[in-house]
Amino acid sequence: KPRFVAGSIGPTNKTCSMSPDVNNPAMRALTYDELADAYREQMEALLEGGVDALLIETIFDTLNAKAAIFAAEKAMEATGIQVPVMLSVTVSDTGGRTLSGQTLEAFLASVQHANIFSVGLNCSFGARQLKPFLEQLAARAPYYISAYPNAGLPNSLGQYDQTPADMAHEVKEYIQEGLINIIGGCCGTTDAYIAEYPALIAGAAPHVPAPKPESLWLSGLELLEVTPEKNF
């Protein structure tokens, strides 16, 4: 079977959208250009190392993600190597927003300019708690959908108690309902969890991406979808 390696690009420990000082809301720990340069250096090394895709993951700040997308385009231009760009978002609570405050629909609007292969969710919660947000993405995103949830939620000692079989039972709903194209595992998972997946996907139909929106999408913290019915 073919095997593909995605180069992982994490969110960094800095944010372009929020201040690290509650007494100075305008302060930023770094600039967009500084972050894009850091991403580009990493991505060029990954491309030269032979990765099959660039995976910008655990996205908590959309502006960080946009810097990473820009860096990916520049890195591929510099190296002459073109690979798919994958995005994976993390939501900060059961309200379904990123840490920087966006809904998932608003996030999609923010990155619609880019040539994206897939968009998905990782970390955040276990498979069952992540499902409602995965449904939101699957209904609106004109891309392939990925998911790699945690092995449930951590206990009081920071450990994960969910077994591979229990997690597979929850992930099976994603597959049966046609929500995903790419499945994996995040915090608390090991190869034993991933080993459960081949049996789940055998003969299953993949998710069919939603059509591209025909109306204008504008992004703030929430999506504004401009249609003829709206006087705007």
Where do the protein language model's features map onto the residues?
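Domain-level signal for soluble alpha/beta catalytic cores
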Residues: 1-232
